[in-house]
């Protein structure tokens, strides 16, 4: 995308102080925990910048989901719990929203998940949407809603591959 850096791993040199997505929990995560979680191996955080300032980010972590919480296509022929990769956070600064950056970051995250699935067993990508608007964003990208929580959504790895043209 024009004007934005390619998503890359967060570093201590990144300016996150003015980041404001409109979601305090996401802003606080980026400012207070993203780098430490990244360094300590709890998650991997990727940022994109404009003019030297972080304007978007996402975080990935390993996880699992119980059969009862997974849509039928996700749990079919899988162990319980089902191995997944968790897209734990995704946010765009308010000043950059509405320009396609969120979609770009999601596609980048999906691409990294597909690469990971080539090396380890992963059935799906799991997200915990914060609210109905976020859920609609993920549904637009073919994420399926959990039968037990309408804000938990999953994307099968085969659908992820199709989405990014892999």
UniProtKB/Swiss-Prot annotation:
Keyword flag Membrane: no
Protein name according to UniProt: tRNA-acetylating toxin
Domain of life of the native organism: Bacteria
Keyword Disulfide bond in record: no
Taxonomic lineage of the native organism: Bacteria, Bacillati, Actinomycetota, Actinomycetes, Mycobacteriales
Active-site residues, record numbering mapped to chain: 138
Binding partners and assembly: Homodimer, forms a complex with cognate antitoxin TacA.
Consequence of gene disruption: The tacA-tacT operon is non-essential and can be deleted without an effect on growth in cell culture.
Catalytic activity of the protein: glycyl-tRNA(Gly) + acetyl-CoA = N-acetylglycyl-tRNA(Gly) + CoA + H(+)
Native species: Mycobacterium tuberculosis (strain ATCC 25618 / H37Rv)
Residue stretches in coiled coil: none
Region (Disordered): 1-22
SUPFAM superfamilies registered for this protein in UniProt: Acyl-CoA N-acyltransferases (Nat) (SSF55729)
Its job: Toxic component of a type II toxin-antitoxin (TA) system. Overexpression of this gene alone in M.smegmatis inhibits growth, while overexpression of the tacA-tacT operon does not. Acetylates glycyl-tRNA(Gly) but not other tRNAs, blocks in vitro translation in the presence, but not absence, of acetyl-coenzyme A. Peptidyl-tRNA hydrolase (pth) counteracts the product of this enzyme in vitro. Neutralized by cognate antitoxin TacA. Does not seem to be active in laboratory growth conditions. TacA-TacT both represses and derepresses expression of its own operon.
Family indicated by similarity: Belongs to the acetyltransferase family. GNAT subfamily.
């Amino acid at each position: 995308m024009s004007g934005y850096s390619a998503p890359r791993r967060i570093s201590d040199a990144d300016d996150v102080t003015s980041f404001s997505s409109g979601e305090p929990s996401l802003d606080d995560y980026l400012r207070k925990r993203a780098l430490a979680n990244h360094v300590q191996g709890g998650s991997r955080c990727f940022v994109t910048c404009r003019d030297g300032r972080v304007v978007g980010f996402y975080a990935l972590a390993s996880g699992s989901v119980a059969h009862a919480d997974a849509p039928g296509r996700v749990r079919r022929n899988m162990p319980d719990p089902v191995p997944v990769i968790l897209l734990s956070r995704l946010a765009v600064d308010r000043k950059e929203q509405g320009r396609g950056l969120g979609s770009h970051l999601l596609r980048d995250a999906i691409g990294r998940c597909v690469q990971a699935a080539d090396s380890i067993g992963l059935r799906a990508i799991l997200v915990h949407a914060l609210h109905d608007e976020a859920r609609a964003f993920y549904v637009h990208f073919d994420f399926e809603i959990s039968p037990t929580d309408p804000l938990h959504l999953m994307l099968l790895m085969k659908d992820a591959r199709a989405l990014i043209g892999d």
